[in-house]
C-alpha cells in the first residue's frame, strides 16, 4: 500500500508511475477523498475541543450563579454530543473508502524497471547454459509422462476436474526429489530458515501480501471463510505482521515447500494440456524481510539463489527483467527465470523474484526499530520462487529425455531417488 502523505506531496509521480503500468491517473481523486476525510477530522476535533471548554465554562457559570448562561452552555454541550456521532461515522466511512482505494493501487516501479506494455517488452538480463545437444525429437511432457505410464490426466479429471494431475511411481518420486533438493539447498547453503506453516489463512494475511481485495477471484475460499494460499509468500511474509523487529536482526530469510492453490480465473484457454498451469502445485518459496538499505542487494541475492537451483540441475535458462506492464501488483521490480522447454521450443517462466519495498510492510503494519534509535520504519519485503516444483519437473522431463523415451535422473537428484538413475516405461 502507498502512503497517502507521499501521494499528497507527489501527485505527478504517482500518476506517472500508474501510466507506466498502463493505468489511469488517480492522484486527484485520492487527494480529494483524503481532503474530505481530513476536513471531517478537523470538524470533529473542533467540536470535541468546544465541548470540553463549554463543559468547563458550565462550572464557572454555576459558581457565579449565572444559571441562564449555565443552561445555555449545557444545551450547547448536549447538541455537540448529539452531533459528534454522525461526524465520527462520516470519518469512519471516509477512512474506509480511502483505505480501500489505496489498497487497490499497485506498487511504484523502481526507476531502472524497463517501461513496457506486456511480456514482449521484458528485457533479457542474462542467459545461462545451452540447449540440449541431443539429436532425437523433442517431445512435450504430457506425451512423455503418459508414454512412461506415470502421468495420468484422465484419472485426475475423474477425481477433481480440469487442471489437475496424478503422478505415480518414479515420476512422483522425481517430483518429491526436486522439492527436497530445493529446500535442502536453500536451508543448508543459502541461509534460509525452513518453515512449516498453515495452508489456509484469514483475510488479513491475504490483505497483507496484496492478494485481497483486488484478486479474490483468483483464489479458493473455504466455507468457513479461510483462503487456500496461492503461494507460501502469504504465510512466510505475514509471519511478521503487526510486529516491530530489531534492525540488527535483519534480514530474516524464510523458505517453505508447500502446495499452492490458484483458480486460474484469468487463464481460460491457456496451457490447458499438461502440468504448466494447475489449480494445485508444489512450490518452494523464498521470502526475505529486510530494511530499506539492504533490499536491492537482497533482491540480487535471492535471484541468484533461485538461479542456483537451475544451474545445479544443468538446465538452460534466462533471467528476464520484467517491464512495468508485466510486473505483479505488489512488486517494485521483478526478475523472472525462464527455463528452456525443448518440447515447446521456447522458454517458460519457472520463478519470479520480486522486491516490494515497504508496500507489504505498510499493509501488514510490520516495522523495525532503527538501530540509531530514531523511531521505527516499515519493513521491506521480497519474495521469489525457488522454484516451482511442477514446472521444474517438466523441464527435467523434456531436457533429460532419451531417445528410447526414458528420462535420465540429473546427478544432483540421485541422493533422493533411492538408487534409481533412469525412469523407464512401466512394465
UniProtKB/Swiss-Prot annotation:
Q: What is its EC number?
A: 6.1.1.11
Q: Where in the cell is it found?
A: Cytoplasm
Source domain of life is Bacteria
Provide the alphabetized UniProt keywords. Aminoacyl-tRNA synthetase, ATP-binding, Cytoplasm, Ligase, Nucleotide-binding, Protein biosynthesis
Alphabetical list of InterPro entries matching this protein = aa-tRNA-synt_IIb (IPR002314), aa-tRNA-synth_II (IPR006195), aa-tRNA-synth_II/BPL/LPL (IPR045864), Ser-tRNA-ligase_type_1 (IPR002317), Ser-tRNA-synth_1_N (IPR015866), SerRS_1_N_sf (IPR042103), SerRS_core (IPR033729), tRNA-bd_arm (IPR010978)
Q: Where does this protein hold L-serine?
A: 231-233, 285, 385
GO terms classed as biological process? selenocysteine biosynthetic process; seryl-tRNA aminoacylation
Q: Which Pfam families match?
A: Seryl_tRNA_N, tRNA-synt_2b
Task: Keyword check for Cytoplasm, yes or no.
Answer: yes
Task: State where ATP binds.
Answer: 262-264, 349-352
| GO cellular component annotations of the record | cytoplasm
- Note whether ATP-binding occurs among the keywords: yes
The UniProt GO MF terms for this protein read: ATP binding; serine-tRNA ligase activity
Q: In which pathway does it act?
A: Aminoacyl-tRNA biosynthesis; selenocysteinyl-tRNA(Sec) biosynthesis; L-seryl-tRNA(Sec) from L-serine and tRNA(Sec): step 1/1
Give the reactions, separated by semicolons, that this protein catalyses. tRNA(Ser) + L-serine + ATP = L-seryl-tRNA(Ser) + AMP + diphosphate + H(+); tRNA(Sec) + L-serine + ATP = L-seryl-tRNA(Sec) + AMP + diphosphate + H(+)
* Primary location recorded for the protein, binned into one broad class: cytoplasm
Its job: Catalyzes the attachment of serine to tRNA(Ser). Is also able to aminoacylate tRNA(Sec) with serine, to form the misacylated tRNA L-seryl-tRNA(Sec), which will be further converted into selenocysteinyl-tRNA(Sec).
Q: What is known of its domains?
A: Consists of two distinct domains, a catalytic core and a N-terminal extension that is involved in tRNA binding.
Please give the family membership noted in the entry. Answer: Belongs to the class-II aminoacyl-tRNA synthetase family. Type-1 seryl-tRNA synthetase subfamily.
Report quaternary structure and partners: Homodimer. The tRNA molecule binds across the dimer.
Recorded protein name is Serine--tRNA ligase
Origin organism is: Allorhizobium ampelinum (strain ATCC BAA-846 / DSM 112012 / S4)
Amino acid at each position: 500500500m502507498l502512503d497517502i502523505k507521499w501521494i499528497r506531496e507527489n501527485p505527478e509521480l504517482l500518476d506517472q508511475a500508474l501510466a507506466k503500468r498502463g493505468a489511469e491517473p488517480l492522484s486527484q481523486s485520492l487527494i480529494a477523498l483524503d481532503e474530505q476525510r481530513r476536513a471531517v477530522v478537523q470538524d470533529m476535533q473542533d467540536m470535541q475541543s468546544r465541548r470540553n471548554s463549554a463543559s468547563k465554562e458550565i462550572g464557572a457559570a454555576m459558581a457565579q450563579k449565572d444559571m441562564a448562561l449555565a443552561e445555555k452552555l449545557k444545551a450547547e454541550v448536549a447538541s455537540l454530543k448529539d452531533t459528534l456521532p454522525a461526524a465520527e461515522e462520516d470519518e469512519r466511512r471516509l477512512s474506509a473508502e480511502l483505505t480501500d482505494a489505496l489498497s487497490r493501487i499497485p506498487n511504484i516501479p523502481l526507476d531502472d524497471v524497463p517501461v513496457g506494455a506486456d511480456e514482449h517488452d521484458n528485457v533479457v538480463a542474462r542467459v545461462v547454459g545451452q540447449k540440449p545437444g541431443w539429436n532425437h525429437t523433442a517431445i512435450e511432457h504430457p506425451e512423455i509422462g503418459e508414454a512412461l505410464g506415470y502421468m495420468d490426466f484422465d484419472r485426475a479429471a475423474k477425481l477433481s476436474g480440469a487442471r489437475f494431475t496424478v503422478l505415480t511411481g518414479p515420476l512422483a518420486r522425481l517430483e518429491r526429489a526436486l522439492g527436497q533438493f530445493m529446500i535442502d539447498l536453500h536451508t543448508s547453503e543459502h541461509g534460509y530458515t525452513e518453515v512449516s506453516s498453515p495452508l489456509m489463512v484469514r483475510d488479513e494475511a491475504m490483505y497483507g501480501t496484496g492478494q485481497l481485495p483486488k484478486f479474490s477471484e483468483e483464489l479458493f475460499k473455504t466455507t468457513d471463510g479461510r483462503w487456500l494460499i496461492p503461494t507460501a509468500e502469504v504465510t512466510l511474509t505475514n509471519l511478521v505482521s503487526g510486529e516491530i523487529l530489531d534492525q540488527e536482526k535483519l534480514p530474516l530469510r524464510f523458505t517453505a515447500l508447500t502446495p499452492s492453490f490458484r483458480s486460474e480465473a484469468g487463464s481460460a484457454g491457456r496451457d490447458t494440456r499438461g502440468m504448466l498451469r494447475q489449480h494445485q502445485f508444489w512450490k518452494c518459496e523464498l521470502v526475505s524481510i529486510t530494511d530499506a538499505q539492504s533490499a536491492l542487494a537482497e533482491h540480487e541475492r535471492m535471484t541468484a539463489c533461485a538461479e542456483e537451483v537451475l544451474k545445479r540441475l544443468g538446465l538452460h535458462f534466462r533471467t528476464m527483467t520484467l517491464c512495468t506492464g508485466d510486473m505483479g501488483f505488489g512488486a517494485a521490480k521483478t526478475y523472472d527465470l525462464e527455463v528452456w522447454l525443448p518440447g515447446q521450443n521456447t522458454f517458460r517462466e519457472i520463478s519470479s523474484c520480486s522486491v516490494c519495498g515497504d508496500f507489504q510492510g505498510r499493509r501488514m503494519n510490520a516495522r523495525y526499530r532503527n538501530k540509531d534509535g530514531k523511531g521505527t520504519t516499515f519493513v521491506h519485503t521480497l519474495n521469489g520462487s525457488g522454484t516451482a516444483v511442477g514446472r521444474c519437473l517438466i523441464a527435467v522431463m523434456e531436457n533429460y529425455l532419451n531417445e528410447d523415451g526414458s528420462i535420465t535422473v540429473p546427478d544432483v537428484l540421485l541422493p533422493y531417488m533411492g538408487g534409481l538413475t533412469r525412469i523407464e516405461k512401466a512394465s
